[in-house]
Design a protein with these regions (language model features):
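Conserved N-terminal phosphate-binding loop of PLP-dependent enzymes in the Aspartate aminotransferase
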Residues: 1-200
Length: 200
């Protein structure tokens, strides 16, 4: 071996820079942030959403909405984001600031948004909707276009971010490069991806 291919992200890594350019060219994103796993990518997206809500939307208590039967990782915060009690059992207290709705159910999402609005006087506000474009753990449920149009509408109206969790759906696993590309041109504000990049 003549050179080290990867070291800490503290240092410039030419291959990582090339991957960042490729990701931007082949997605709706205009920047890339690298970390070490899918759970860490979702943790970073949660941190990004909270910081954005506090600094740009002036929300004191940011709330992130996620779907029931979702899967977002195995850290304490990402199991909280994961809408499945079986992954949360015995790991409490869980990270505050999450509420849940039924996947592909506009009425359920509306109710979750209204619950956050009702707590506005306590400083609560919608920071993000973190959602998979296709649920894997939830029984392989494809996202419905009309539902995701509503997700986009809610985020546009409130200023919240739509974060697409592409850890299980990205890099061609749904027939398109990214899962959100199956939604007839509706695009998220940010998306996460992970292990599939080792296939490049």
């Amino acid at each position: 071996m003549d050179r080290v291919n990867h070291v800490s992200n503290l240092y410039f890594i030419p291959e990582q820079a090339a991957l960042a350019k490729w990701l931007v060219k082949n997605s709706c994103g205009d920047k890339a942030f690298f970390c070490n796993s899918g759970a860490e990518a979702n943790e970073a997206a949660i941190k990004l959403s909270r910081k954005y809500a506090k600094t740009k939307l002036n929300i004191d208590y940011p709330v992130i909405l996620t779907a029931l039967e979702s899967f977002h990782g195995r850290t304490v915060t990402t199991i909280t984001a994961t809408g499945q009690p079986k992954y949360q059992k015995d790991f409490g207290p869980l990270t505050p600031g999450f509420e849940y709705f039924e996947y592909n159910n506009i009425v359920s999402l509306q109710a979750a948004v209204e619950k956050i609005k009702a707590a506005k006087d306590q400083g609560h506000g919608l920071a993000a909707i973190l959602i998979e474009p296709l649920q894997g753990e939830g029984g392989v449920k494809a996202g419905e276009v009309e539902f995701f149009k509503y997700v986009r509408q809610i985020c546009d109206e409130t200023g919240a971010l739509w974060v697409s969790d592409e850890v299980q759906t990205g890099m061609g696993r749904t027939g398109k490069m990214w899962g959100y590309q199956n939604l007839e041109g509706i695009e998220p504000d940010a998306f996460t991806s992970a292990k599939v990049h080792s296939n490049l």
